[in-house]
Amino acid sequence: MLAMGADSSFAPALPGYDFEFPRDHGAHDEYQTEWWYYTGQLEADDGRRYGFEVTFFRVGIVPPSARRLAAGEPASKLPALRGDERPAGNPWDLHDLSLAHFAITDVKSKDFRYYEKLNRTSPFTASQAAGHLDVFNEGWRAVTMPDGAWRLVAAAGGDAIDLTLRSHKAPAVHGQNGVSIKAAGVGGASHYYSMTRLEVSGIVDGRRCHGLAWMDHEFGSSRLRENQAGWDWFSIQLDNDTELMLYQIRRRDGTPDLTSSGSLITSDGSVIHLGHDQMRVQPLARWKSPKSGATYPMGWRVSVPSLQIAVTLQPLLNQQELVTRESTRVTYWEGAVSVSGSFDNVAVRGQGYVEMTGYDRPLGALR
């Protein structure tokens, strides 16, 4: 996760970054940490409902400049890499770690199952292409198909998905001037965009399904500050063809950090930036995990008064927590939610996902 340790040898996320697609769907080795996050809700032909999460992480160990020096390139001749270039050197050297999470929420059986992977990045076990989307980790993969759609596959235990995702909107870039601020100071930010309305069709556990998904792609070299405990992130897809992304960085005293922000994505794909003072998030209940002992908010009232948005989010299951001892070693809650409320005084319904970190221990303390 982006809260993990930062190395100043990697590039900081700075204002002025110009996104370019499909280039920026690919990997960015010059930044230390990067993730591709897929979440969605699906309905099978027989009415069975599912939530899913598939996430690919890349954590840099050796920055590209050091790899190129090791390959014999003189420091005076090391121009910046383009987004579609990879550094020279032996591809089997340990440059990056590749981690992945896969989770299924089975609403009918009230069951939540998750799986994790950790590998060194190498040509045949786990890698991330530059310049276009193609990331994989031991058989789990997100890749661009010839017609421009994405294919997402993962299988573990008794669970398997094989999904086709087609975007109905352009990428939504979050933040301002190319950066999403997470902490005070130079480089305390990430480059962050989302694909907020992905039409999905495919197979989940042998059942043909359809639905909506959301993809986040974020890259940077920062970590949470010592006084920051974690974050609460919300993705909301409404039936009026608008979407809402909010994140609240939590301080250790439980109050929202001033770097918290969000975005409203309109029906035509325009992105409206939301500052911390425009958002309201009110927890409605609490749930204590029997696995980690962490106590999480459970149910939320989310509002943006300036846009006349007021919605209530309810989890499809309380138990949607991942305790990832074999990969990222971060305990977090990532779960499917239902959404109902009003937008500009008109009733709306929808779906979403919520992510909560730092409730078992502050992430800002991780080094």
Regions found by a protein language model. Name each.
Residues 1-367:
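Structured soluble/peripheral alpha/beta segments that form catalytic or ligand/cofactor-binding pockets
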